[in-house]
Structure formats: C-alpha cells, structure tokens
Amino acid sequence: MSLEALDQLQEKVQKMLEANALLQMEIEEFKEKNIVLEEKINAISAQQKDLVDQNNELKQEKTVWQNRLNSLLGKMDDI
C-alpha cells in the first residue's frame, strides 16, 4: 500500500470513530429521555388509577343517595 492510501484509510477510520462517538452520545441522550418519559408515564398511570378509584367512590355515593331519595319518595307516597 502506498503512503497516500494509508493516509486515506487512516482518515476514514478516524471519521468512523468520530461518527461512532457521536452516535454513542445520541444513544445516551435517548436513554436519558426514555427514563424521563417512563417516569412521566408512571406518574400519569398513578393519577389515572387515583381518578378511577375516586370515580368508583362517587358512583357508590350516588347509588346510596339515589336509594335514600327513592326511599323518601316512597314514604311520601305512603302518606
């Protein structure tokens, strides 16, 4: 191999190493963003669970109040 060919090969290898380093940095950034997104998903999932629980409690309270109201209306009809 000529010296010129070796220089070109060395330059290509250096460019590939630099590109590889940049890609590794991008991968690390994506991993960090992924962690943040997973934390947000977990927080939203917890909020959703709380809202579902609260909704179920409100539905139960509504049923209790409807039963009480129907009972009172039934007593009024008896009078």
Swiss-Prot record:
InterPro entries assigned: Cell_div_ZapB
Any coiled-coil regions, as ranges: 1-78
GO process annotations (BP): division septum assembly; FtsZ-dependent cytokinesis
Main location: cytoplasm
Localization: Cytoplasm
Keywords from the UniProt entry: Cell cycle, Cell division, Coiled coil, Cytoplasm, Septation
Domain of life: Bacteria
GO cellular component, one term: cytoplasm
Bridged cysteine pairs (disulfide): none
The protein's role, per its UniProt record: Non-essential, abundant cell division factor that is required for proper Z-ring formation. It is recruited early to the divisome by direct interaction with FtsZ, stimulating Z-ring assembly and thereby promoting cell division earlier in the cell cycle. Its recruitment to the Z-ring requires functional FtsA or ZipA.
Family from the record: Belongs to the ZapB family.
Subunit structure: Homodimer. The ends of the coiled-coil dimer bind to each other, forming polymers. Interacts with FtsZ.
Protein name: Cell division protein ZapB
